Amino acid sequence: GELNDEAEDLHYFGGEILDAYVFANFNVGDVGANVRLCRHTIYWGQSLFLIGSVHSVGGSMNTFDGIKALSVPGSEARELFRPTNKLSTVIQLSDSFTVEAYASFEWENIRIPEATTFFSAADILYEDYEMFLLTVAPAFPGFDGPVGIGLETQDDEYSDSGEWGVNFSYYFENSGLEVSAYYLYYNSKVQDGKIGVINAAQGLTVGFFDEQIRALGLDPEPIKAAFGEAPDVVSAELGQVSIGKYKWMYKEDVDLYGLSFSKDLGGISLGLDLTHRRNTPLRSNTTQVVQSAFDNYPAPLAPVLEANFGPEFDFDGADGANYPRVPVGNTFPAVFNGVGFLTDTGIWQGGSYAFELVLAYLDEVTQGEELLMSTPTISLEEGDTSSNLALAFNPTWYQVFPGVDLTLRTSANIGLHGSAPNGLGGDEEVGLGTIGLEASVNQLWSADIRYNFFFGPQRNEIGAQWKDRDNISLTFKRTF
């Protein structure tokens, strides 16, 4: 089949300019400073890989390229981050004390593979998707209507301004320990929040509320007839009707407080990030969120509908700043990692290895606890913890051919325990990995061939959907 227009635009546009900024270096007395303006990336914290960065500081500051993350498993987080327009500065107050700050004036959500492409995920993730199908909820007893409900997409607008952060770093020369303290005020880039609303008047015509009407001693048919025909059938074969609308929202005004520590110990560069997020979006039960909100109550039924389903929901007024009916709370993630270099053992001549352990704790749900993710395989609640492990092992052989070095590229990422409270934070037993060979020619050109694989239970959650997408990739790169 053919790719849709959005897929062709994203996957076949030929190239793009990433970093494009102006900068200045100057001194004020004995204090050195650097300032950058326009499209660039800054990356605080110690996280190495994607899951670690999602839970740490770097993934909160930046959006990232999910297409590359899937195409090249094991990519370091800094290779996935995408630049946005911002103003940033680094001020070197002394040899040991550094202050950094930034203010962003461009917001961009994460880039995911478009629909109809090899790595495309659930269609509902795309803003151009037209229908979201729901099974009939137990809240509508006796309903004998279509097998699903289609809801029309209504896109939302997001603020490009308001994100900022500050970083204080101190290097203890005697111990070789660097300590950093962070504060970020940011907007989520991950699709954690979806809200929808069912048009109650339309729902009435297709029989949603028959049981509630009969409970009042009334005949639903004359009442339904007063509101005209049922909505047009979107799919005659499936009997789906469009009786509502939904949209994605990205939570604004999230607070992050963080500490990080880094030190070389025994030839290994160790890093630790401890963060606390307040007012952060949590993973939600999408079906329950959408089919438990209504607008356009028919006047004769308004009292009974309000008694059963609550007041009418202001769908159009909801956005990232006014974030109703989506779970929000506070979390405590921790990221611990290490990077080391391989020495000549006779089996290999050099190379590197890395590990990253991620822990996440759901401390408090401050809004929408009843709407937290709840499926047969994932059920979140306050006090839950999750863990995730990433490993990379890359031995190298030098001058295998004149000017050619070979490196074996291996990496894997797996959810060890539980499910993360935030989107893309990892799920138990779900993971991905890669094994391949990279040839570097004169340290300028490289060719990389890999077998990339995905594993874990076949489930509906994001991440498990790529279990059947194992592939072989070939990459050429030129360094300037």
List each language-model region with its residue ranges.
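Outer-membrane beta-barrel "beta-signal"
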Residues: K467-F480
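Membrane-embedded beta-strand positions in outer-membrane beta-barrel channels/transporters
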Residues: D19-Y21, K86, G165-N167, G258, ...
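Solvent-exposed loop segments that connect transmembrane elements
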Residues: E2-E6, V54-V72, A115-E152, Q191-Y246, ...
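Short loop/turn motifs that connect adjacent beta-strands in outer-membrane beta-barrel proteins
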Residues: F23-V35, W44-L48, S96-V99, I112, ...
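Transmembrane beta-strands of outer-membrane beta-barrel pores
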Residues: R39-Y43, A103-N109, F172, Y183-K189, ...
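Outer membrane beta-barrel
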Residues: G1-D123, N388, H417, G426-G431, ...
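Transmembrane beta-strands of outer-membrane beta-barrel proteins
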Residues: G1, A33-L37, T98-A101, L177-V179, ...
